[in-house]
């Protein structure tokens, strides 16, 4: 009983407002009241009004929302609704929404503090939780894009997605405008791309046009240098292949006359300074055929040594695995003729591009994040604190992945047109890479320890990833401790357990044999798992994504395809090198897609800076505030460090890390 002050916030995207009328009801623990027709929401605004309620409501639990139209449906994007009352001394309640209100269906928004099923001992939200999840499970269904790969949302086009998972208008316009620019550039450059082969490495400058970064310029000038080649395994676009050697790889069969190399490798191994990058996943993958022309793949092994000054130098490259009964493949070294050594390094760089895009970027970034997104929508109601914690980091992931499946890795998509793994090989590689997707590999403290990278002063990816993980983990623990006081509370939360099980057993297709948990038994284990989810959707994806425009724009440093087989003899010439590297048309397509995927986004939310307030309670706000302060401090620390580096490492600066997989 008394006067309630109502505030309603509408989103700022182009079509967030609505000409339709909005009706509201207040639902309290002891009663409910219809507020009637109140307003027509305007974009990027707050509506405020007071309503005299005659009923006694008690503590508020929900706001019920219904939009009504007479002639034309006009969707409304509601941010939140705030209610204070009764009277000026009454409590203030916030009801987060952050979704589209469509048609005339009724939407119940629970009060925003959030609670677990264990905390909801009176069952005040029980029916709402069950009804919301039932509706969500019908909207968000698992799909299987290709047999043998992890699951995805059941949507073959953007129109199949629930509207809340689609790009909002500003994001959509910016993304599609970039696609148009890339297509126009390909058409404009087509006449000069009709030649079948570049004549010299300098010819790649024809497609190295405006839009590149300062780092891409550095790559163009330094890509032949051995130290620069080795640096990329530590801090380049794909720092996920390198590991410290604990023994000489079994595949490393030395041809006659290479006893000195073997002795050198043994010596580096004893000192603990021997490292390897093994691209064995590419072995046996069928190479693409582009415009009736056979393309080629290799499965290189690179052996590198760590110098006292921190430089990582390549000392041996084997391009193919030995075959039983065949002559061992050649091992290339820096002592070989310069053209042979350069060609071998080009093969490694091409192989690294294939694994980067398919394993490190698509699988470990996009597809795994999509599993988290679908499972979260299916298993955690909006009132659940873990839903509130995760949902800002799942924004736009489903749509960007639908676009990837329809434009990039589909039949006649980008991979088929220009990548040596296209034409079906990319699907086989995804399946093989999925078999090596372990839980520990998604957790930097475990992954970096397993790969022996924690004590390398010049591995800035490792340093920044570990620090960022620790900041995220403290944030997750801070939020988690507000809602789970004991390990038993974790075990008794059947929604949380169902979510974890659905990720591991269904989305990741039985990943428990690769270390993923099917249940969460303690607060520490749950926080580790949730930190892994957030890190994967933010920092890990950005560490792989942000380097594309730097490292892949100069085509010889990351050839999208190779047009001659891997060399079996050491007799390379410039003509052979140029006949192997991508032709003009392939080069143009590569840099256009690299620009589209790797450019800095005009519509981008930095890590932790989401405007949505899913936790309106002061305790949770304090945890988020501390998280943002720690991110700002780490960002400043990295900025200061980078000033003293010859090559700044910025891919894990919190201000550049995107808050979700949205590109």
Swiss-Prot record:
Induction record: Up-regulated in response to endoplasmic reticulum stress (at protein level).
Q: Where is the PLAT domain?
A: 2-115
Pathway in which the depicted protein is active: Lipid metabolism; hydroperoxy eicosatetraenoic acid biosynthesis
Q: Which domain of life is it from?
A: Eukaryota
Which Pfam families does the entry link to?
Answer: Lipoxygenase (PF00305), PLAT (PF01477)
Task: Identify one Gene Ontology CC term for this UniProt entry.
Answer: lipid droplet
Tissue specificity, please? Found in pituitary and pineal glands as well as leukocytes, kidney, aorta, small intestine and cornea. Also expressed by resident peritoneal macrophages (at protein level).
**Catalytic activity from the UniProt record:** (5Z,8Z,11Z,14Z)-eicosatetraenoate + O2 = (12S)-hydroperoxy-(5Z,8Z,10E,14Z)-eicosatetraenoate; (5Z,8Z,11Z,14Z)-eicosatetraenoate + O2 = (15S)-hydroperoxy-(5Z,8Z,11Z,13E)-eicosatetraenoate; (9Z,12Z)-octadecadienoate + O2 = (13S)-hydroperoxy-(9Z,11E)-octadecadienoate; (5Z,8Z,11Z,14Z)-eicosatetraenoate + 2 O2 = (14R,15S)-dihydroperoxy-(5Z,8Z,10E,12E)-eicosatetraenoate
> What molecular function terms (GO) are annotated for this protein?
arachidonate 12(S)-lipoxygenase activity; arachidonate 15-lipoxygenase activity; iron ion binding; linoleate 13S-lipoxygenase activity; phosphatidylinositol-4,5-bisphosphate binding
Q: What biological process terms from GO does the record include? A: apoptotic cell clearance; arachidonate metabolic process; bone mineralization; cellular response to calcium ion; cellular response to interleukin-13; fatty acid oxidation; hepoxilin biosynthetic process; linoleic acid metabolic process
Chain sites annotated for binding Fe cation: 361, 366, 541, 545, 663
Compartmental location? Cytoplasm, Cytosol; Cell membrane; Lipid droplet
Question: Which InterPro entries does the annotation name?
Answer: LipOase, LipOase_C, LipOase_C_sf, LipOase_CS, LipOase_Fe_BS, LipOase_mml, PLAT/LH2_dom, PLAT/LH2_dom_sf
**How does the record classify its membrane topology?**
Peripheral membrane protein
Q: How, per the record, is the cofactor bound?
A: Binds 1 Fe cation per subunit.
Enumerate the Gene3D superfamilies for this protein: 3.10.450.60, Lipoxygenase-1, Domain 5, PLAT/LH2 domain
Alphabetized, the UniProt keywords read: Calcium, Cell membrane, Cytoplasm, Dioxygenase, Fatty acid metabolism, Iron, Lipid droplet, Lipid metabolism, Lipid-binding, Membrane, Metal-binding, Oxidoreductase
Knockout consequence? Mice are fertile and do not display overt phenotype. However, reduced endoplasmic reticulum stress response to high-fat diet is observed. Aged mice also display systemic autoimmunity, a significant and spontaneous production of several forms of autoantibodies being detected and glomerulonephritis and deposits of complement and immunoglobulins within their glomeruli being observed. They also display reduced bone mass.
Residue stretches making up the Lipoxygenase domain: 116-663
Q: EC number(s) of the enzyme? A: 1.13.11.31, 1.13.11.33, 1.13.11.-, 1.13.11.12
Q: Which cofactor does it need?
A: Fe cation
Q: What is known of its domains?
A: The PLAT domain can bind calcium ions; this promotes association with membranes.
Similarity comment text for this entry:
Belongs to the lipoxygenase family.
Q: What does this protein do?
A: Non-heme iron-containing dioxygenase that catalyzes the stereo-specific peroxidation of free and esterified polyunsaturated fatty acids generating a spectrum of bioactive lipid mediators. It inserts peroxyl groups at C12 or C15 of arachidonate ((5Z,8Z,11Z,14Z)-eicosatetraenoate) producing both 12-hydroperoxyeicosatetraenoate/12-HPETE and 15-hydroperoxyeicosatetraenoate/15-HPETE. It may then act on 12-HPETE to produce hepoxilins, which may show pro-inflammatory properties. Can also peroxidize linoleate ((9Z,12Z)-octadecadienoate) to 13-hydroperoxyoctadecadienoate.
Quaternary arrangement and interactors, per the entry?
Interacts with PEBP1; in response to IL13/interleukin-13, prevents the interaction of PEBP1 with RAF1 to activate the ERK signaling cascade.
What this protein is called in its record is Polyunsaturated fatty acid lipoxygenase ALOX15
What is the species listed in this Swiss-Prot or TrEMBL entry? Mus musculus
């Amino acid at each position: 009983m008394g006067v309630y002050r109502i505030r309603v916030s509408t989103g700022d995207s182009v079509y967030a407002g609505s000409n339709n009328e909005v009706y509201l009801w207040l639902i309290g623990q002891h009663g409910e009241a219809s507020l009637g027709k109140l307003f027509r929401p305007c974009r990027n605004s707050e509506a405020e009004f007071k309503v005299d309620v005659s009923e006694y409501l008690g503590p508020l639990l929900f706001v019920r929302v219904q939009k009504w139209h007479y002639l034309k449906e006009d969707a409304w994007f509601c941010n939140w609704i705030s209610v204070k009352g009764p009277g000026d001394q009454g409590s203030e309640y916030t009801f987060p929404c952050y979704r589209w209100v469509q048609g005339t269906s009724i939407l119940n928004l629970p009060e925003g503090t959030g609670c677990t099923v264990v905390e909801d001992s009176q069952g005040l939200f029980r029916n709402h939780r069950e009804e919301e999840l039932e509706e969500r499970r019908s909207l968000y269904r698992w799909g299987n894009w290709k047999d043998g790969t992890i699951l995805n949302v059941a949507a073959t086009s953007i129109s199949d997605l629930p509207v809340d998972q689609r790009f909002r208008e500003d994001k959509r316009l910016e993304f599609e405008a970039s696609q148009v620019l890339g297509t126009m550039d390909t058409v404009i450059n087509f006449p000069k791309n009709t030649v079948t082969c570049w004549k010299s490495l300098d010819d790649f400058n024809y497609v190295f046009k405006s839009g590149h970064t300062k780092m891409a310029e550095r790559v163009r000038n330094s890509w032949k240098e051995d130290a620069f080649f080795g640096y990329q395994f530590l801090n380049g676009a794909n720092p996920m292949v390198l590991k410290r050697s604990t023994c000489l790889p079994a595949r490393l069969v030395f041809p006659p006359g290479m006893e000195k190399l073997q002795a050198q490798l043994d010596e580096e191994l004893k000192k603990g300074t021997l490292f390897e990058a093994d691209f064995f996943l590419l072995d046996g993958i069928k190479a693409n055929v582009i415009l009736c022309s056979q393309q080629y793949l290799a499965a290189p092994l690179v052996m590198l040594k760590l110098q006292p000054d921190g430089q990582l130098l390549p000392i041996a490259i084997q391009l193919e695995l030995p075959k039983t009964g065949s002559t061992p493949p050649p091992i290339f070294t820096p002592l070989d003729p310069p053209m042979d050594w350069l060609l071998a390094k080009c093969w490694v760089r091409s192989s690294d591009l294939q694994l980067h895009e398919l394993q490190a970027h698509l699988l470990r970034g996009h597809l795994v994040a999509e599993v988290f997104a679908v499972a979260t929508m299916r298993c955690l109601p909006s009132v659940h604190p873990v839903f509130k914690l995760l949902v800002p980091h799942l924004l736009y992931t489903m749509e960007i992945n639908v676009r990837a499946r329809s434009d990039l890795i589909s039949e006649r998509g980008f991979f088929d047109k220009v990548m040596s793994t296209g034409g079906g090989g990319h699907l086989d590689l995804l399946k093989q890479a999925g078999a090596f997707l372990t839980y520990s590999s998604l957790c930097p403290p475990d992954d970096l320890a397993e790969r022996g990278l924690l004590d390398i002063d010049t591995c800035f990816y490792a340093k920044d990833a570990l620090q960022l993980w620790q900041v995220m983990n403290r944030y997750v623990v801070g939020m988690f401790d507000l809602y789970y006081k004991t390990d038993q509370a974790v075990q008794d939360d059947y929604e949380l357990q169902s979510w974890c099980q659905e990720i591991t057993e269904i989305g990741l297709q039985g990943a428990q044999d690769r270390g993923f948990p099917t249940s969460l038994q303690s607060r520490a284990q749950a926080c580790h798992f949730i930190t892994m989810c957030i890190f994967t959707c933010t920092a890990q994806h950005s560490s792989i994504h942000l380097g594309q425009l730097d490292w892949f724009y100069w085509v010889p440093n990351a050839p999208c395809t190779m047009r001659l087989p891997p060399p079996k003899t050491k007799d390379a010439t410039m003509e052979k090198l140029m006949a192997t590297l991508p032709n003009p048309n392939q080069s143009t397509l590569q840099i256009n897609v690299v620009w589209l995927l790797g450019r800095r986004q005009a519509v981008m939310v930095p890590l932790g800076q989401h405007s949505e307030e899913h936790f309106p309670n002061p305790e949770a706000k304090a945890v988020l505030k501390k998280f943002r302060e720690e991110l700002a401090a780490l960002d400043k620390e990295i900025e200061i460090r980078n000033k003293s580096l010859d090559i700044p490492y910025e891919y894990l600066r919190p201000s550049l890390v995107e808050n979700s997989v949205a590109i």
